[in-house]
């Protein structure tokens, strides 16, 4: 065998994750690649895997024939198309992402949506290189589609009006990526693909732009990922579990991606379970039938062995407690099992160990989602008391209730069930449960609630403070001189509340406001500009007061300190001035008063 052939064989198929918001075109893109005219000619050229589609290099070359200029060693591309969030959060392996590359599909006309945000945050967590497919260019006003044509060729045939519409949408999309910390540009304007995210305008429906999209993926894999694609063909099989599900007639099975080595029927494998490492023997390895028959569900082809990279279904005993998102490995000895157990334990600790004494309780469906959510919560500065995989039980509620801060008495549940009695327990202990199937939405709703609660508490604190106020006694409205003195006043600045003490400009205490009446009705509070009658205790007009003075609300020292430190900017100018005058009165004898 020539050296060149050996090299080609030594590189495994790169794994490409296809991510994006629902209805933005993930399935349409893969369907288009599967059903392109080329594929029809090369009967059976594309292999359908469990949760994945393998596109060999020959097919990619045919699709890209008009623009193919590169010498390539990789055998093709394996696209992972597991539905829903699982495609995001389970695509993990030790030391990062299971996917070597990703396509982030965004509807160019709609821009970013919650699942787009989620996909980006996971790509960031796992440091996965990605390309943005700006889909649905066929819906841009004025755009004339040319089926299966490279984007640049189609773009050259468009009217200026359509080109401008495309550029405007691209500009918005690139700006959205930039706001999230990614430098991006249209693919043909990039010189260094390691520093800038390539944006490829495509129509998954019409096939436009798909040649460039595939070419860029192949180029990125070939140029920047070659080291990661070295394959130990004879080595032990290693992979990641995408989903654990029951199949009629087979029992509980694992859908998995084999990313290294070879897996054979009869191999002994170790997989991370919910409470312990599960060691079992592979009874069967299943793959779907060829593409042309793939719509026939429930029919699988049994194979004796499989080499990476591949999407497979593993049939084996004792898979009930396997964790989706966890790794599996072929083990040949007790020592192998011990090493695997130690690695799993360390990995789980690395993900969940950095917990805080005070913080929220986090429960997720997989290790991948746990890792992604911890990362997102840390970025938001939210403390985490406990982070685990599994359904929410009463113990989680009790743990959350033990927090001192009410804002941390929270359970965040991502794509897991609330076990019976949990909601009643939460009501009993005053614990809030947030549950959602989209990471971005779960965190957004929690952060929004937390901020609203924090502001409500601040408002309550502010409400409880005695605020600054300045009043003028109206001499022509002295209704009673003593026991209590009743006099008309005008509020000059700030506010006047029932029960506050009053002082003179020289600091002499006057007495407390017992009651307040405005237009014959009792009131508890009056604001600047109001005129009303007030009853003042322990004072006689004509002795302690003349009846035409300006008086200040005697703000307690503790309250004055908070107002000066935290609330000064929220006061209007008149109130601010009155408060400063009040502080000067107090600090005449004691310069450190209220500091």
From Swiss-Prot:
The protein's name in its UniProt record: Probable translation initiation factor IF-2
Gene Ontology CC annotation, any one: cytoplasm
HAMAP family: IF_2_A (MF_00100_A)
Region G1, annotated ranges: 20-27
Chain spans, region G3: 81-84
Binding locations of GTP: 20-27, 81-85, 135-138
Location of the region described as G5 in the Swiss-Prot/TrEMBL record: 203-205
Record has Transport as a keyword: no
Bilayer-crossing regions: none
PROSITE patterns: G_TR_2 (PS51722)
Family matches, as Gene3D superfamilies: P-loop containing nucleotide triphosphate hydrolases, Translation factors, Translation initiation factor IF- 2, domain 3
Role summary: Function in general translation initiation by promoting the binding of the formylmethionine-tRNA to ribosomes. Seems to function along with eIF-2.
């Amino acid at each position: 065998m020539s050296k060149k052939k050996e090299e080609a064989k030594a590189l495994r198929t790169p794994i490409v994750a296809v991510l994006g918001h629902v209805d933005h075109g993930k399935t349409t893109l893969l369907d288009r690649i599967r059903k392109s005219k080329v594929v029809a000619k090369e009967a059976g050229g594309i292999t359908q895997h469990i949760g994945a589609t393998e596109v060999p290099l020959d097919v990619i070359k045919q699709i890209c024939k008009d623009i193919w200029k590169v010498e390539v060693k990789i055998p093709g591309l394996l696209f992972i198309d597991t539905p829903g969030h699982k495609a995001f959060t389970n695509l993990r392996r030790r030391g990062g992402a299971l996917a070597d590359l990703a396509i982030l599909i965004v509807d160019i006309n709609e821009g970013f949506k919650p699942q787009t945000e989620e996909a980006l945050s996971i790509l960031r967590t796992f440091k996965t290189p990605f390309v943005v497919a700006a889909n649905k260019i066929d819906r841009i006003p004025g755009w004339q589609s040319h089926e299966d044509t490279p984007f640049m060729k189609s773009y050259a045939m468009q009217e200026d009006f359509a080109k401008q519409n495309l550029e405007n949408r691209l500009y918005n999309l690139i700006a959205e990526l930039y706001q999230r910390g990614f430098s991006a540009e249209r693919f043909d304007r990039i010189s260094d693909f390691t520093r800038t995210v390539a944006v490829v305008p495509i129509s998954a429906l019409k096939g436009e732009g798909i040649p460039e999209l595939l070419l860029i993926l192949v180029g990125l894999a070939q140029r920047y990922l070659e080291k990661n694609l070295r394959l130990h063909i004879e080595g032990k099989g290693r992979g990641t579990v995408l989903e654990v599900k029951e199949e009629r007639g087979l029992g509980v099975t694992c859908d998995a991606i084999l990313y290294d080595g070879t897996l054979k029927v009869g191999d002994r494998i170790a997989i991370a379970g919910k409470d312990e490492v599960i060691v079992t023997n592979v009874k069967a390895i299943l793959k779907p039938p060829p593409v042309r028959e793939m719509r026939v569900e429930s029919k699988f082809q049994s194979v004796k062995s499989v080499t990476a990279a591949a999407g497979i279904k593993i049939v084996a005993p004792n898979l009930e407690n396997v964790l989706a998102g966890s790794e599996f490995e072929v083990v040949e000895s007790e020592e192998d099992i011990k090493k695997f157990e130690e690695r799993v334990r360390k990995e789980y600790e690395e993900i969940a160990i950095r917990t805080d004494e005070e913080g929220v309780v986090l429960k997720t469906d997989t290790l991948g989602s746990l890792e992604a959510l911890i990362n997102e919560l840390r970025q938001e500065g939210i403390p985490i008391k406990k982070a685990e995989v599994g359904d929410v039980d009463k113990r989680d509620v009790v743990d959350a209730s033990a927090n001192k801060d009410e804002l941390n008495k929270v359970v965040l549940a991502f794509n897991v069930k609330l076990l019976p009695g949990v909601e009643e327990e939460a009501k009993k202990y005053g614990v809030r449960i947030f549950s959602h199937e989209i990471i971005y939405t779960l965190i957004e709703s929690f952060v929004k609630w937390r901020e609203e609660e924090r502001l409500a508490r601040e408002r309550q604190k502010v409400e409880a403070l005695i605020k600054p106020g300045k009043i003028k006694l109206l001499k022509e409205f002295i209704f009673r001189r003593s026991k209590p003195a009743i006099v008309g006043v005008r509020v000059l600045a700030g506010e006047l509340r029932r029960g506050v003490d009053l002082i003179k400009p020289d600091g002499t205490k006057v007495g407390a406001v017992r009651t307040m009446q405005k237009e014959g009705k009792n009131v508890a509070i009056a604001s600047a500009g109001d005129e009303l009658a007030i009853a003042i205790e322990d004072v006689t007009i004509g002795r302690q007061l003349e009846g035409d003075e300006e008086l200040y609300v005697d703000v307690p020292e503790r309250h004055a300190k908070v107002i000066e430190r935290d609330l000064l900017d929220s006061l209007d100018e008149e109130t601010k001035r009155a408060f400063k005058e009040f502080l000067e009165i107090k600090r005449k004898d004691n310069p450190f008063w209220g500091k």
